[in-house]
Amino acid sequence: MTVIDVLPQTQRALKIVGPNAVSVNAAAPLPDIEPTDVLVRVVCVSINPVDGKAADMSPQLGATSGTDFSGVVVALGADVEADNWREANTMKPVRIGDRVFGGIFGNDPLRPHNGAFADYVAVPARLVWHIPTGTDFATAATMGAAIATVGLSLFNYLGLPLPSKSKAGLPVVTTCSAASSTNVLQLGAEAWFDYKSPTCGADIREHTNDSLAFALDCITDTASMGICYEALGSAGGRYVALDAFPVRGHTRRSVVPEWVCTPTQFGKAIRWTPPYDLEPRPYDLKCAELWYVVAQRLIDEGLIASHPLEKRNGGLSAVPEGMEEVRRGQIKGKKLVYTILDSEPIAVSA
């Protein structure tokens, strides 16, 4: 293993201590570094709804919480330097001192010392992105899980072709609130529809001339599933949810439903409580690796916009309060970001 400097024996980590309960452990072990991993000194983290939801629905006592991170590579697993996969796919290799971001599987009973809400996080070298010049750690920390989820959802579960060029060229319509409409149109949506409207699904079907074939449900409750099913054309199509969908919402035989659990991108089993107890999905890993190549190009070209963010003070100790705000639905249209490390590790490369 190659390291930037002498690593500490312990770290600060936000640990699951009970249902919907987390606490900072100031003397937690560092995560083990697998041969294909890089170890990242975390600079910033952001909160996703899944962080609190996982601690509530499937708490793994003693596991480190957290998904999204950005930071600096401080150690390489034994096989990383010899693996030329990134170079073969026109990606810059990951080396010590690189600024990177990504998402990891926190609250993992099979790897309890690894999670984003900590001083250090281990992540596969193939499944991490470089932070482009001009992008700060706070902004990068908002994007990892979102980009990974989009890739699995669109190009694996919905079955859309992975774009060979910068853009897929597919027309997009979306639901949102009126307050977010200008933003989504600027980001490239063809049209937006108010999800609170009782005619939302019908309006989308009319706008798309009864031809909509693919729906991605980022909310996944009975109401959002109903909108998607009504919006899909009479010929049917594919519906993908970002959570286990309510079976009673599957009201059309012509629609094929699926749901995404993004940690399957790592190709390992997930041992949460049902329905989140999943066997390894090697094809999800393969798809993720291909998508990360395309996504890095989109990131470098400035074609992926970050989510609006709110920087919070207090560092790691303040993250539990933010998790609770997100869990209660008090944070809308933005992501909370916390700085874990005030200065970068030494010997950072350009």
Curated annotation (Swiss-Prot):
Q: Its pathway?
A: Mycotoxin biosynthesis
InterPro entries given in the database record: ADH-like_N, GroES-like_sf, NAD(P)-bd_dom_sf, PKS_ER, Trans-enoyl_RdTase-like
Record's catalysed reaction(s): N-[(4E,6E,10S,12Z,14E)-6,10-dimethyl-3-oxohexadeca-4,6,12,14-tetraenoyl]-L-tyrosyl-[ACP] = (3E,5S)-3-[(2E,4E,8S,10E,12Z)-1-hydroxy-4,8-dimethyltetradeca-2,4,10,12-tetraen-1-ylidene]-5-[(4-hydroxyphenyl)methyl]pyrrolidine-2,4-dione + holo-[ACP] + H(+)
CDD domains listed in its UniProt record: enoyl_reductase_like
GO terms for molecular function, please? nucleotide binding; oxidoreductase activity, acting on NAD(P)H
Q: Which SMART domains match?
A: PKS_ER
Under which main EC class is this enzyme filed? oxidoreductase
* Keywords of this entry: NADP, Nucleotide-binding, Oxidoreductase
Specify which residues bind NADP(+) according to the UniProt entry for this protein.
V50, D51, G52, K53, S177, A178, A179, S180, Y195, L242, D243, I331, K332
Domain of life, per lineage:
Eukaryota
List ligand-binding residues for substrate.
A145, A146, I147, A148, T149, V150, G151, L152, T262, P263, T264, Q265, F266
EC number(s) per entry: 1.-.-.-
Q: What does this protein do?
A: Trans-enoyl reductase; part of the gene cluster that mediates the biosynthesis of ilicicolin H, a 4-hydroxy-2-pyridonealkaloid that has potent and broad antifungal activities by inhibiting the mitochondrial respiration chain. IliB collaborates with the hybrid PKS-NRPS synthetase iliA to assemble the backbone of ilicicolin H. The PKS portion of iliA and trans-acting enoyl reductase iliB work together to construct an octaketide, and two methyl groups are introduced by the MT domain of iliA during the chain assembly.
Similarity comment: family membership = Belongs to the zinc-containing alcohol dehydrogenase family.
Q: How does it assemble?
A: Monomer.
Please state what the protein is called.
Trans-enoyl reductase iliB
